[in-house]
């Protein structure tokens, strides 16, 4: 897995799964990269979303890092953004550690969206005006958003 946090400038390249097990140190590092960048609050990310990112990377046939716009979002941050009318869901999967908003330098957001839809691993939100795709490990569904980052 290769991740770059667009807000903090931090990046990580790691193997988080080997020999049928998650690698604790790698998962800890992923949780750090995907933390709420406003509060530095960390929540363990759901294994389903980590696996979804891995499958998405494989489907896109790329080793380029995912550029993370948003991973975990604390309830406090989510509420503030919701009240500001930024366009976040009141009960966002980001709060549960089950969602990541991302893009990639090596693939278009349309390619990412199409690959994510093909996986049928959860929700896929396409935000062309903001330049990212939302993926989560919740129920399979799709939407087009209009949020500007």
Report residues per predicted region.
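Catalytic cores and adjacent binding grooves of peptidoglycan-active enzymes
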Residues: 4, 84-149
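Short, solvent-exposed loop/turn and secondary-structure capping segments
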Residues: 14-15, 80-82, 114
């Amino acid at each position: 897995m290769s991740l770059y946090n667009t807000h903090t400038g931090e990046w990580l390249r790691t193997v988080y799964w080997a020999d049928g097990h998650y690698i604790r140190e790698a998962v800890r590092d992923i949780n750090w990269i995907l933390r709420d960048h406003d509060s530095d609050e960390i929540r363990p990310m759901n294994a389903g979303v980590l696996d979804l990112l891995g499958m998405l990377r494989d489907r896109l046939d790329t080793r380029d890092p995912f550029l993370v716009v948003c991973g975990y979002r604390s309830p406090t941050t989510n509420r503030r953004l919701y009240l500001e009318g930024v366009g976040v869901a009141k009960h966002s999967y980001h709060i549960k550690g089950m969602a990541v908003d991302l893009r990639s330098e090596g693939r278009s957001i349309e390619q990412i969206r199409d690959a994510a839809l093909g996986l049928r691993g959860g929700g896929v939100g396409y935000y062309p005006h903001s330049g990212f795709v939302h993926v989560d490990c919740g129920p399979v569904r799709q939407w087009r958003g209009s949020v500007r980052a």
